[in-house]
Amino acid sequence: MAKTDDREMTYRPLGRCGTKVSVFGLGGWTTFGGSVRNRAAVRGIIRAAFEAGINFYDIADVYADGEAERAMGAILRAFPRHKLVISSKLYFPCSGDINDRGLSRKHIRESVERSLKRIGTDYLDIYFCHRFDKETPLEETVRAMDDLVHQ
């Protein structure tokens, strides 16, 4: 368990990729829920989390219909990007479009691009599949995710 600076936060390896994440993270669902209400309060929460040494911030495209990604991204831009580990997720529909759901290659590529724009970053450190997609072959999902890693 590595510590950094003179903070009390503990960091652990994220798998075997070399990245370390704080043992505590800040999640978009608990922060924003189904809507983005009081941005000033959320800004204070995120600032306090960052100052406490939390470096892991998790969000999803579906939270508050994309507004949670926009709000968290706008707040996180106040901090050095290299000190953040940002994740998002996909699976659930964010529109009425028939292909805006699941884990198909098409949806993965389009969803990550929209998330990057909403969050206001060039890359995500982690991109999660929010759940298993029984309609898409696992091989297609894995290949599409691997393509993202190699971009």
Show the residue positions of the predicted features:
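N-terminal, well-ordered alpha-helical segments
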Residues: 44-47, 70-74, 88, 106, ...
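N-terminal binding-site loop/beta-alpha segment at the start of enzyme catalytic domains
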Residues: 1-84, 150
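Glycine/proline-rich, positively charged
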Residues: 95-151
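N-terminal small/glycine-rich loop or linker at the start of catalytic domains
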Residues: 16-34, 87-100, 123, 128
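Active-site loop signature of alpha/beta-hydrolase-fold enzymes
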Residues: 62-65, 93, 134
